[in-house]
Amino acid sequence: MAEIKKSKETKKSKDISKNDISYKYMPISIFDVQKMGKKGIRGKRNWSKNKTVPSSRSTYSPFPPDVAEWCAMYFLRDKNNIFDPFAGWGERHKAIKDSSKNYIGFDISPKAIEHAKKTYNVDNILANSMTDEIPTHDGLLTCPPYWNLEKYESKDGLDHDDTWKNFLENYEKLWQRVTKKALSGSTYCIMVGDWRKKNVFYDLSYQTEKVMEKCGMEPFDKVILSYKKISPIKLLLPQCKRLGYSSKVHQYLLIYRKP
């Protein structure tokens, strides 16, 4: 009888593991991002001797599908209407769609919207989160643009602000607009990182935390998204050692809730 009972418990455990995302991705504070098998949508990085070594942050596009899936099925598991103010290339939309939730994603790039449709068969909306009406939502999954690091073809985006100060001012205005349409109890998943360019350090993760506090959002969790296993560390280290700073091989997943 004991053996039969044990067998039933084992089978039950296996069945649970198929449906519980916490079995697929360990709910711990350091998440090892999986390799996506390509350099990124915007093309390969130029590592030639005639070019300066670019910021390691430029390897972090597109959005990691495993992170999107984990957010959709774990942090947003009890949410239904997910908004994305920077919809991007479609990975997040697909993850939300696969988890049987509603997704509305705004993006100012026709190229990104076309890619999302062609690659993932999802329909993002050509709209600007700075000016267009924000939909009511109870969840959010996004990754904001990294000023002076990535440029889109539309000149209406935050990435085209002429200074870091102007970027941060408009960044806060955008989040004020978005969070006002979030229902009480909403959960936000924001993937964000820091980077260095031309010897200047840009702390977008800290700036985002400050903005969320101003918007009345409460911190719920923070996860380190580690790219250590898939980053070209050996290529980055010489310049880091010469200038005395660390190579950025991680991003953050900031989880916020609206009271």
Predicted regions and their residues:
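Class I S-adenosyl-L-methionine-dependent methyltransferase catalytic core
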Residues: 1-259
